Curated annotation (Swiss-Prot):
Signal peptide: none annotated. The lineage of its organism: Bacteria, Pseudomonadati, Pseudomonadota, Alphaproteobacteria, Hyphomicrobiales. Substrate binds at residues 143-147, 176, 189, 287. It catalyses: L-threonylcarbamoyladenylate + adenosine(37) in tRNA = N(6)-L-threonylcarbamoyladenosine(37) in tRNA + AMP + H(+). HAMAP family: TsaD. It is found in: Cytoplasm. Its cofactor is Fe(2+). This is tRNA N6-adenosine threonylcarbamoyltransferase. One of its GO terms (cellular component) is cytoplasm. It comes from Rhodopseudomonas palustris (strain TIE-1).
Length: 363
């Protein structure tokens, strides 16, 4: 399979709490077209528990995935026999869900004699801007989601260098934990963002983690503890207390992330020259305050900011299909014995920063 022909790829995403499928076309010139994108969120199933329950997530994927795939194929007007490839997120993620999606993709590929592409979920986020904006390599990726916060040099398909990572909580995870701590509904990230809009960001003097460091790593656990301590002093919390705590927390995150991105962009330029763009991906990139901060960071270093539409920042099948198409165009396919992976580094050579070997930064 070469890039000199158009490719139609079905993508399947089941790594967490969205069941999704999509069909994309990758044209011979490398441009892309989204033919369908069906996403079914499991928010209602997990809301009573205040977070994602892996067993419930896996069972929900089993219940609806066939219908989601059928809807995606129908909307695209594509028959299975016309597909150039079938792509599925093979990790990282909740292993039960990953198994559901990857096994389904294998079955489709076997029945129709279609190539299988096992996609790294993080690579799919990294390559999405090439579908939406045709961005050229190399670019600097800020990946911010519930499970990951990284700064990555995207040098080509399958060629990634991690410049910075969180040593504890991911940004989306921290937002969700703050929401739960303050009694806000699940999913917590949008609730914190909404409350922050009505709050005073200057009422509380929260720390700005990792500010001024030469590396490009993140840390949010200390900030989370500071919010918990202030909330404990005010219990019971009234609505304005909650708004102000959220505003102060979000302001601290924004300042810290802006500083860390500045360091990451400096490291990128030192190693690879100026990036073609600063790209943001992952669910946290749907936060409008984060988007405003990203525009300021990009303007400061005189680079272009590219952020996919919110529906393509959160988990979706289109990003899996597109990553599959990009890999298929290079002749990269996978065998039927490809294993699902709970952990899967985007940069296979990444190592934990000094003093953080036993933290999340080691993954």
């Amino acid at each position: 399979m070469t890039s000199e022909q158009a490719l139609l790829v079905l993508g399947i995403e089941t790594t967490c709490d969205e069941t999704a499928a999509a069909v994309v076309e990758r044209r011979a010139d490398g441009s892309g077209r989204l033919l369908s994108n069906i996403v079914r969120s499991q928010t209602d199933e997990h809301a009573p528990f205040g977070g994602v329950v892996p067993e419930i997530a896996a069972r929900a994927h089993v219940d609806v995935l066939d219908g989601i795939i059928a809807a995606a194929m129908n909307e695209a007007g594509v028959a299975f026999a016309s597909l150039s490839g079938v792509a599925a997120a093979a990790g990282p993620g909740l292993i039960g869900g990953v198994i559901v999606g990857l096994t389904t993709a294998k079955a489709i590929a076997l029945v129709h004699g279609t190539p299988l592409i096992a996609v790294n979920h993080l690579e799919a986020h990294a390559l999405t801007p090439r579908l939406t904006d045709a961005v050229e390599f190399p670019y600097c990726l800020f990946l911010a989601s519930g499970g990951h916060t990284q700064i990555v040099a995207v040098l080509g398909v399958g060629n990634y260098v991690r410049l910075g990572t969180t040593v504890d909580d991911a940004i989306g995870e921290a937002f969700d934990k703050i929401a739960k701590m303050l009694g806000l509904p699940y999913p917590g990230g949008p609730q914190v963002e909404r409350a922050a809009e009505a709050g005073d960001p200057n009422r509380f003097a929260f720390p700005r983690p990792m500010l001024g460091r030469q590396d490009a790593n993140f840390s949010l656990s200390g900030l989370k503890t500071a919010v918990r301590n202030e909330a404990g002093k005010l219990t019971p919390l009234d609505p304005q207390d909650i708004n102000d705590l959220c505003a102060g927390f979000q302001a601290a995150v924004l300042e810290s992330v802006a500083d860390r991105l500045g360091a990451g962009l400096r490291l990128f330029k030192e190693r690879f020259g100026p990036p073609k763009a600063l790209v943001a991906a992952g669910g946290a990139a749907a936060n409008q305050a984060i988007r405003r901060m990203l525009r300021e960071v990009a303007a400061k270093v005189q680079t272009t900011l590219i952020v996919p539409p919110p529906s393509l920042c959160t988990d979706n099948g289109a990003m899996i299909a597109w990553a599959g198409a990009e890999r298929l165009a290079l002749g990269l396919t996978d065998t039927m014995d490809t294993a699902p992976r709970a952990r899967w580094l985007l940069d296979a050579n990444a190592t934990a920063p000094a003093k953080f070997a036993n933290t999340r930064a080691g993954f």
